[in-house]
Amino acid sequence: NSGNELSFSKFDIAHRIMVQAAYTTPKYWNNWMSTSISVIYNAFSGSRYSLTMNEKSDFNGDGFSGNSLLYIPTESELAKMNFVDEYDKNELVRTAEEGRQAFARWIENDDYAKNHRGQYAVRNSNLSNWEHEINLHLAQTIYNPKGLGKLEFTFDIINFANMLNKKWGVNYSSAYNLSPLTVASLTTDNNGQKTPTYYFNNAK
């Protein structure tokens, strides 16, 4: 595989911020006890993922489906792509033209795709949203009055902010791929030329 193009690792974390604050009370209750509390803030740029096509067939002939990197068409190329109506249990979900327009809007709303029209997406090109997490650590220490050791009870709350508001501390880790486009069918003519049809996925 030495000829493969270099790309970002799936596990690449471009940026990380970590802040910790802690406080321990003086001993109280006749020097039998003390209490410690720690607050840990952890933030990092999101997980990397690839833009691919959701294939119902082996689109690129590598023996696998669902792993073909997305070609991001120019406006003129998009106008020539063969979209088809999308159905769910015989009910029309989206017409071919609606699918084309939805894909065009998706391209304009994705920073990477918008700036790489006319190219194939590179592996792990995109980053999900930043993730923020606040963890709480509480420790209650009981001292032996004769100085023969101590007993400590701890209590941890992981992702404390998410307990207060479900929109805080959200984990955006994605699967390895995001597929805004499905290859609905792939026909091959007598000359071996493949002609795909497409419909749009509701990619986030």
Identify the meaning behind each predicted range.
Residues 1-47:
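Gram-negative outer-membrane beta-barrel transporters
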Residues 30, 44-51, 162-167:
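Outer-membrane beta-barrel proteins
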Residues 147-151, 164-173:
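Short conserved catalytic/interaction loops centered on acidic-Pro-aromatic/His motifs
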Residues 29-31, 146-149:
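Short, solvent-exposed loop/turn segments that connect beta-strands within catalytic domains
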Residues 36-145, 152, 174-203:
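Extracytoplasmic gating/loop element in the C-terminal half of outer-membrane beta-barrel translocons
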